[in-house]
Amino acid sequence: GLWIKGNYCLRGRCLPGGRKCCNGRPCECFAKICSCKPKLIGKLSALKKHT
């Protein structure tokens, strides 16, 4: 799945204009289903992307 930070979720689906998912924590979105990820893991993932 892809790491999407600040994803919007509505009833477990990723939608624009929906409720902000996970209180600003990173989300993993797969098949329009959002999963919340711990902040630490999200930061590590982001660091790996920018390296």
Curated annotation (Swiss-Prot):
Q: How is it modified after translation?
A: Contains 4 disulfide bonds.
Grouped into one coarse class, the protein's main location is secreted
Q: Which GO terms describe its cellular component?
A: extracellular region
The tissues in which it is expressed are: Expressed by the venom gland.
Q: Where are the disulfide bridges?
A: 9-22, 14-27, 21-36, 29-34
InterPro entries per the record? Spidertoxin (IPR004169)
Entry keyword set:
Disulfide bond, Knottin, Secreted, Toxin
Q: Which SUPFAM superfamilies match?
A: omega toxin-like
Subcellular location(s) of the protein: Secreted
One GO molecular-function entry: toxin activity
What the record says about family reads: Belongs to the neurotoxin 02 (plectoxin) family. 07 subfamily.
Entry text on domains: The presence of a 'disulfide through disulfide knot' structurally defines this protein as a knottin.
Query: What's this protein's name?
Result: Toxin CSTX-18
Which lineage is the organism of this entry classified under, starting from the top rank?
Eukaryota, Metazoa, Ecdysozoa, Arthropoda, Chelicerata
